[in-house]
Amino acid sequence: MEALGFLKLEVNGPMVTVALSVALLALLKWYSTSAFSRLEKLGLRHPKPSPFIGNLTFFRQGFWESQMELRKLYGPLCGYYLGRRMFIVISEPDMIKQVLVENFSNFTNRMASGLEFKSVADSVLFLRDKRWEEVRGALMSAFSPEKLNEMVPLISQACDLLLAHLKRYAESGDAFDIQRCYCNYTTDVVASVAFGTPVDSWQAPEDPFVKHCKRFFEFCIPRPILVLLLSFPSIMVPLARILPNKNRDELNGFFNKLIRNVIALRDQQAAEERRRDFLQMVLDARHSASPMGVQDFDIVRDVFSSTGCKPNPSRQHQPSPMARPLTVDEIVGQAFIFLIAGYEIITNTLSFATYLLATNPDCQEKLLREVDVFKEKHMAPEFCSLEEGLPYLDMVIAETLRMYPPAFRFTREAAQDCEVLGQRIPAGAVLEMAVGALHHDPEHWPSPETFNPERFTAEARQQHRPFTYLPFGAGPRSCLGVRLGLLEVKLTLLHVLHKFRFQACPETQVPLQLESKSALGPKNGVYIKIVSR
């Protein structure tokens, strides 16, 4: 009894604290590495993960460089961990086809972090399963050639402001960062086309829309918070969603209120009075269900296999009423995605194309001749003439997107356990398509670091191995806005090159340093000179 009493005394004393501390440390040690055996069990090679954070430090130089390193060290099928989340990285064309097309029903959804802005989460980019299918089907009509043709004048109006600004640099002869000019220009396009709110970023940098756009793209998660989110996602992600965040709430509130005000105004107007912009196209489609099936959603396939802008017969059907019309939040979400793609991706694509033309004057001269001939025939270009009348510009843009794909990685989630070409994929796994590594694989693209638009002649395209060129993804969940994005890039370069010639100068960084926190872009801008023609 005395012994038991002694034991009881000790158990109730400091040893309890010590025992609990040891148990907690042991639990933390186990937790810190418990998620890091899954890739090995799948037979996939990967960098050695660090406790809690996985391979976060592997990506400190940026996702673009690290993607290339992963492909080089571990092959076309490998993996990594960000915190406790496992990623399976694929740069093998046949397997990509299986994931994006053949087994699409099991890989319908994109990965979501749970931290997306409310407006982004309600966009077609992140909607899931049946609701994604309904909204995507409704929005398909907003990107028809007929609807896009109505947006050409709005893009051209914003381009006029860009040309006036560039003229000052041509007159001064000074080197300048043309990426900053494209940033202002794409802000104007997004405001006008997606939010129904014309702005002039050049003359009114303090405009509320301009300021909130800059705040949105400057928004980032502090590194210590990121480490906590990755290390303890089941606790930290729900906590981050409910905790007050003034910056996030102000941005959400501004864009939401802006769209709601425009919708209220449009609903009061007669149809002929309404501005014909992207927002109106979405509003027109909000009650209409598409008669198409998921198999008809692959708009990228249509764009790259079409002969001009002839309508697709499978899409010539009358829509039926939608069982659950698009909500205001979902309409705001589509405008928000236009903001992300229209600002960052279009800006970077224009910047890369300008850099490549400035540093490859022979290609630029060939393009200038095509532009001049086109302008003689089409002083006010329309969508169809842009689609069919500028083959070399198409080749230049295609090669730009091969070398510098802004969306150089995208994901799909496995809904159920499955096997893809002999590789076991567990339910919930995140599959990452390594577009950058694929586009720079010499097996598919000889001399991949060389700018060569001739890779994309009509004859050369026929020789490309399928699923080795994915700047807009592939399959039913490929980029819905591909036509609009290409239209904006083509129309901009057409107008700019009709007036100016790009010149490399001592300030031009060759080769460009790249930044890849999200989309791929120039790290230090694109400094060139321009000369009036």
Curated annotation (Swiss-Prot):
Catalytic activity field: prostaglandin H2 = thromboxane A2; prostaglandin H2 = (12S)-hydroxy-(5Z,8E,10E)-heptadecatrienoate + malonaldehyde; a hydroperoxyeicosatetraenoate = an oxoeicosatetraenoate + H2O; (15S)-hydroperoxy-(5Z,8Z,11Z,13E)-eicosatetraenoate = 15-oxo-(5Z,8Z,11Z,13E)-eicosatetraenoate + H2O
UniProt effect for mutating L356V: In allele CYP5A1*5; KM value about 1.5 higher for PEG2; Vmax/KM approximately 27% of that of the wild-type
Localization per Swiss-Prot or TrEMBL: Endoplasmic reticulum membrane
Effect of R477A: Loss of thromboxane-A synthase activity. Decreased heme-binding
Cofactor: heme
GO molecular function term, any single one: thromboxane-A synthase activity
Tissues showing expression: Platelets, lung, kidney, spleen, macrophages and lung fibroblasts.
UniProt pathway: Lipid metabolism; fatty acid metabolism
Biological processes per GO annotation: icosanoid metabolic process; intracellular chloride ion homeostasis; positive regulation of vasoconstriction; prostaglandin biosynthetic process; prostanoid biosynthetic process; response to ethanol; response to fatty acid
Endoplasmic reticulum is among the record's keywords: yes
UniProt xrefs under InterPro entries: Cyt_P450 (IPR001128), Cyt_P450_CS (IPR017972), Cyt_P450_E_grp-I (IPR002401), Cyt_P450_sf (IPR036396), Cytochrome_P450_3A (IPR050705)
Classification via PANTHER family: CYTOCHROME P450, CYTOCHROME P450 FAMILY 3
Protein name, entry field: Thromboxane-A synthase
Organism: Homo sapiens
Gene behind this protein: TBXAS1
